[in-house]
A protein has these predicted regions:
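Exported/periplasmic cell-wall-interacting domains
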Residues: 2, 6, 47, 99, ...
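Mature exported/compartmentalized surface modules and terminal targeting/interaction regions
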Residues: 2-11, 31
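Bacterial N-terminal signal peptides
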Residues: 10-29
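N-terminal hydrophobic or amphipathic segments with adjacent small-residue motifs
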Residues: 18, 61, 72, 81, ...
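Cell wall/extracellular polymer interaction/catalysis modules
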Residues: 31-104, 112-126
Length: 179
């Protein structure tokens, strides 16, 4: 995909060079660029069709592309006092090795990596007066394995599972959270 993206950028740049582009078009040398640009769109198209479905009652998150279910993983969700929000959302941003800030023990500490409370992958999906909600890894796999309702509203996944989901979706991927 990176190669296709580079080729496409090269193909788009010559538009500012109209005489060269016209000569290339007449000579037929532009066709490979057009084919590469189409190939990139074909490769990227399925990602736009992807959506994430979180079923709170099953405590399961599923990646769907078109009508095909690509993966399903157990999750821990928000505690009843701080529930995971329901509704239609989209992935707002994606972070590798996000920083988790804690003030426990009276001092500010920054934690990151798979042993931090949010693991080594984080995808934000909603912001409101309570803060930001995300799908992330965890340092406590037990809560995910028993599909507990223990978080402050975020969705916790096993670190290996969030990495799979993280790599399969883009920012703006749709997220449906339902009961």
């Amino acid at each position: 995909m990176n190669t296709l993206r580079l080729v496409s950028l090269v193909c788009l740049m010559p538009w500012s060079l109209a005489p060269v582009m016209l000569a290339g078009l007449l000579a037929g040398s532009v066709l490979p660029c057009l084919a590469a640009e189409s190939a990139e769109l074909a490769v990227r198209q399925p990602a736009r069709e992807s959506r994430i479905v979180l079923d709170l009652s099953k405590r399961q998150i599923t990646l769907v592309r078109g009508e095909q279910r690509l993966g399903a993983w157990p999750v821990a969700i928000g505690d009843p006092k701080t529930p995971t929000p329901k509704g239609e959302f989209a992935i707002l941003n994606k972070k590798v090795n996000p920083i988790y800030v804690t003030h426990k023990s009276g001092q500010r500490r920054e934690l990151r990596g798979p042993s931090s409370p949010i693991g080594d992958r984080y995808m934000a999906f909603h912001r409101n007066g309570r803060g930001e909600f995300g799908i992330h890894g965890t340092a406590w796999p037990h809560w995910v394995q028993i599909r507990a309702a223990v978080s402050l509203g975020c969705v916790r996944m096993l670190n290996s599972h969030i990495r799979q989901l993280f790599d399969a979706v883009d920012v703006e991927t749709r997220l449906e959270i339902r009961s």
